[in-house]
Amino acid sequence: MGDAIRIIGIDPGLRRTGWGIVESLGNSLRFVASGTVRSEDKAALATRLCQLHDGLAEVLHAAMPHEAAVEQTFVNKDAVATLKLGQARGIAMLVPARAGLVVAEYAPNAVKKAVIGVGHGDKKQIHMMVKVLLPKATFDTEHAADALAIAICHAHHRQSAAYRMALAG
């Protein structure tokens, strides 16, 4: 059947970036770890981005995932906040890419559909289903729970023929 694939899901945020790691073997999923990388609210933007970078790099070095998945950001009315979130997302994509991992991206509604079966649902439903799908899962913040949902989404999507074709070519 092959070896288990270790997947890190990343929920980017400037204050808190959640991460969650699962192992996928066939149709089964196993919880590995989760957590949250925090940046100092009062620090300069560049310093905060460095804190996110260093924290995620430490997680990747320790956990040795094979693939990564990052949630796409939404655009809101506050352009400055959206730009800062985009910069944090850039760090969330850069760190695994620099480690040589393929980085997949998923829209929030795709994550919800993969985890709860519909593209629109609230955080409570998502977190409940994460616990159903990964009974041993623990998470310190909602960001870590969201990151586990992103990893679950990637585990489901990587089984598709279209995903395998994209990797091959």
Swiss-Prot record:
Residues in coiled coil: none
Localization (cell): Cytoplasm
Homology family: Belongs to the RuvC family.
Residues the entry annotates as binding Mg(2+) 1: D11, H143
Active site: D11, E71, H143
Top-rank lineage group of the source organism: Bacteria
Ligand binding (Mg(2+) 2): E71
Top EC group: hydrolase
UniProt cofactor note: Binds 2 Mg(2+) ion per subunit.
UniProt EC number: 3.1.21.10
Described purpose of this protein according to its UniProt entry: The RuvA-RuvB-RuvC complex processes Holliday junction (HJ) DNA during genetic recombination and DNA repair. Endonuclease that resolves HJ intermediates. Cleaves cruciform DNA by making single-stranded nicks across the HJ at symmetrical positions within the homologous arms, yielding a 5'-phosphate and a 3'-hydroxyl group; requires a central core of homology in the junction. The consensus cleavage sequence is 5'-(A/T)TT(C/G)-3'. Cleavage occurs on the 3'-side of the TT dinucleotide at the point of strand exchange.
Main location: cytoplasm
GO molecular function, one term: DNA binding
Reactions the enzyme catalyzes: Endonucleolytic cleavage at a junction such as a reciprocal single-stranded crossover between two homologous DNA duplexes (Holliday junction)
Keywords assigned: Cytoplasm, DNA damage, DNA recombination, DNA repair, DNA-binding, Endonuclease, Hydrolase, Magnesium, Metal-binding, Nuclease
One of the GO BP terms on file: DNA recombination
This protein's name: Crossover junction endodeoxyribonuclease RuvC
Cofactor (UniProt): Mg(2+)
Pfam family, one: RuvC
Keyword Hydrolase set for record: yes
Cross-referenced PANTHER family: CROSSOVER JUNCTION ENDODEOXYRIBONUCLEASE RUVC
Organism: Mesorhizobium japonicum (strain LMG 29417 / CECT 9101 / MAFF 303099) (Mesorhizobium loti (strain MAFF 303099))
InterPro entries given in the database record: RNaseH-like_sf (IPR012337), RNaseH_sf (IPR036397), X-over_junc_endoDNase_RuvC (IPR002176)
Subunit structure: Homodimer which binds Holliday junction (HJ) DNA. The HJ becomes 2-fold symmetrical on binding to RuvC with unstacked arms; it has a different conformation from HJ DNA in complex with RuvA. In the full resolvosome a probable DNA-RuvA(4)-RuvB(12)-RuvC(2) complex forms which resolves the HJ.
GO cellular component, one term: Holliday junction resolvase complex
